[in-house]
Regions:
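Generic beta-strand hydrophobic packing signal
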Residues: 4, 66-67, 296, 329
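Hydrophobic residues within membrane-embedded alpha helices
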Residues: 4-7, 20
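One-carbon transfer enzymes
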Residues: 8, 12-13, 27-278, 331-333, ...
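An anion-binding loop in the catalytic cleft
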Residues: 257, 263-355
């Protein structure tokens, strides 16, 4: 039996210490010395989810159905572009459905057809990763179920250690809050917002070298490994309720959060810059021109908030307390640059004040 609290190890690694017996249920094929292959339905949209889908395919599982969000306009030409999950699904010849919604007035016939397809897919488990659409209870209960008690019908791959950072932007909010650790949880889904029982966890340390893009990539790989490892022996999985203490919510990122508040403590300013890289970005204004800062670390220094204290390998800017060393910056309409060529292009001078 796998106990979730025994499955946490450092560096995003999870170990399952068990000796399984063959599962002879219809739809499952046990192969001694290899993985247990079964029928899996999948829902997800971004790269975080696409990596998990690739890993499940590589592990030999049969993907019965893929749900992902509709194609979106992208690039300067605003041409419709499929989601990363759809691209993977099409590459492997999988059935892909892209309903606008699965419940509510927007669901319509397309949403109903997707739910019916999910129910008729004869899947043993429904794996969800950053899908982006609200799933009705009907979808959560569509699969047959795995686990010791057979009750795990849908599994969510969530990029935090629950109950901390339930919601839409757990990676960004963890960096913004200066957390020292985050990770990936596999969660038995229920109708609440990331409130389901935890199946297993893989913690990952957060350092000052992580921005949101880098941490997302790391957690993406951890999540892909975690779901494959868990489903090697699905009949042994257990689950436990989330702790009642320590619940926090990772609210959706907004473009209105971009402006840097230089009166804040330098550690907070630097954390927000890294948390909002690449989206929504962190901006300041110099002589009426908007400047985006992509990466920064807190350093010692004092001056008027927003004042440039040094220019070189980093542009050092004073905050309410301390200063931040900015090493990657960008002018509007221009590519991002390292600090030194950026400062030269704008002829930045010590003593200037950014707002």
């Amino acid at each position: 039996m796998i106990k979730p609290e025994e499955s946490r190890f450092a560096a995003g690694t999870i170990f399952f210490l068990l000796f399984p017996t063959p599962d002879r249920r219809p739809g499952l094929t046990f192969r001694y010395g290899e993985h247990l292959s079964m029928r899996i339905a999948f829902a997800g949209t971004p790269d975080f989810a696409a990596a998990a889908l690739k890993a499940l395919i590589a592990a030999g599982h049969t993907i019965t159905l893929v749900l992902t969000q509709p194609d979106r306009p992208s690039g300067r030409g605003m041409k419709l572009k499929p989601s990363p999950v759809k691209a993977v699904a099409l590459e492997h010849g999988l059935i892909v459905l892209t309903p606008l919604a699965l419940r509510g007035p927007k669901a319509g016939d397309e949403g109903e057809a997707a739910l019916k397809a999910l129910e008729e897919s004869e899947s043993y488990v429904f794996v969800v990763a950053a899908y982006g659409l609200i799933l009705p209870e009907r979808a959560l209960n569509a699969a047959r179920g795995v686990g010791e008690d057979g009750s795990i019908k849908s599994i969510n791959i969530h990029a935090s250690l629950l109950p901390r950072w339930r919601g839409a932007a757990p990676i960004n909010r963890a960096i913004e809050a200066m957390d020292k650790e985050t990770g990936v949880d596999l969660m038995k889904m229920d109708i609440g917002l990331d409130t389901g029982d935890v199946i297993c966890s893989a913690p990952v340390a957060i350092t000052e070298d992580h921005d949101a893009a880098q941490l997302t990539e790391e957690l993406t790989q951890v999540g892909a490994r975690l779901i494959v490892t868990a489903l090697e022996h699905p009949e042994t999985l257990t689950h436990r309720p989330q702790l009642e203490n320590g619940v926090t919510y990772a609210k959706k990122l907004l473009k209105t959060e971009s402006p840097i508040v230089w009166t804040q403590d330098a550690r907070q300013v630097a954390a927000r810059i890294r948390a909002f890289s690449p989206f929504p970005g962190s901006t300041t204004v110099r002589n009426g021109e908007t400047v985006k800062i992509w990466f920064a670390k807190a350093v010692e220094g004092s001056g008027q908030p927003g004042e440039i204290l040094a220019v070189g390998d980093a542009v050092v800017i004073a905050c309410g307390t301390g200063a931040v060393a900015c090493t990657r910056l960008q002018r509007a309409g221009k590519p991002a640059m390292d600090a030194k060529p950026f400062a030269q292009s704008l002829q930045l001078k010590i003593g200037e004040v950014l707002v």
